[in-house]
A protein has these predicted regions:
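Catalytic strand-loop-helix junctions within cyclic-nucleotide turnover domains
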Residues: 81-90, 107-110, 115-132, 158, ...
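PAS/PAS-like sensory domain cap-loop motif
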Residues: 200-212
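A short pre-motif secondary-structure segment
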Residues: 68-72
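Flexible, glycine/charge-rich interdomain/linker segments that couple
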Residues: 123, 142-165
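Short regulatory alpha-helical coupling segments
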Residues: 8-26, 57-65, 165-168
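Catalytic-core segments of nucleotide cyclases and related cyclic-nucleotide turnover enzymes
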Residues: 46, 91, 122-148
């Protein structure tokens, strides 16, 4: 593979096994991506975008312990699962990794890039892998809203806040679309609703979105 680490499907399968086989263990899931990766591709080209992805994957392999499960979800998003770690164990390390200089090569020169990172703890905030990743994703989304190039631990309420932000975005996008519809994430373990337009609420007899949750 391009990065030499697990793809999304391989990572998800192994992460599921690790958590299922060790229900009493603590885990920390980490989601991270390259800030403004689209601009890296647009300015330097996809070959050099790939160099940035490889560079980040190599940094992850060198920095995190050998027992860490490393994967790439696709695009510029990467994921890590750390077994027998808690927030207190990882806070300083993840901050250090986020702030460490990261570069890729372009025409013989090194160019810097930054990352954003969100993480969540199992079983404190989640009862399964899917929920754990969703919490880490909410923390990553929050750091993106606050200027990128940083890391954040998940805390109660972040997921709802992220969902509301997405709801506002979907409302703007769908304002002129005809018909009744909802937007949700289909998940075999835990479906998640993002948005329902007024036509759908009227058709189903609900007053507002809150009644659907």
């Amino acid at each position: 593979s391009l990065t030499g680490i697990y793809n999304r499907y391989g990572f998800d399968e192994l992460a599921e096994q690790m958590i299922t086989k060790n229900p009493e263990a603590k885990f920390v899931a980490v989601l991270l991506d390259i800030d403004d990766f689209k601009f890296v591709n647009d300015i330097y080209g996809h070959v050099y975008g790939d160099n940035a992805l490889k560079s980040l994957a190599d940094s992850m392999k060198a920095f995190f312990p050998s027992g860490a499960l490393l994967g790439r979800n696709g695009g510029d998003e990467f994921v890590i699962l750390l077994k027998d770690y808690s927030y207190d164990d990882v806070k300083e390390k993840l901050q250090q990794f986020t702030m460490a200089p990261k570069t890729f090569s372009y025409k013989g020169k090194e160019h810097q890039f930054s990352i954003s990172l969100g993480y969540a703890e199992y079983p404190t905030f989640a009862s399964n892998r899917s929920q754990l990743m969703r919490c880490a994703d909410a923390a990553l989304y929050e750091i993106k809203l606050h200027g990128k190039n940083g890391c954040m631990a998940y805390k109660e309420g972040l997921e709802l806040r992220a969902r509301k932000q997405l709801g506002f975005a979907f409302k703007d996008i769908s304002e002129n679309l005809p018909g009744a519809f909802i937007i949700y994430r289909a998940d075999k373990e835990d479906d998640e609703l993002f948005y329902a337009n007024q036509e759908f609420l009227h058709m189903t007899g609900y007053k507002d979105m809150d009644e659907l949750f």
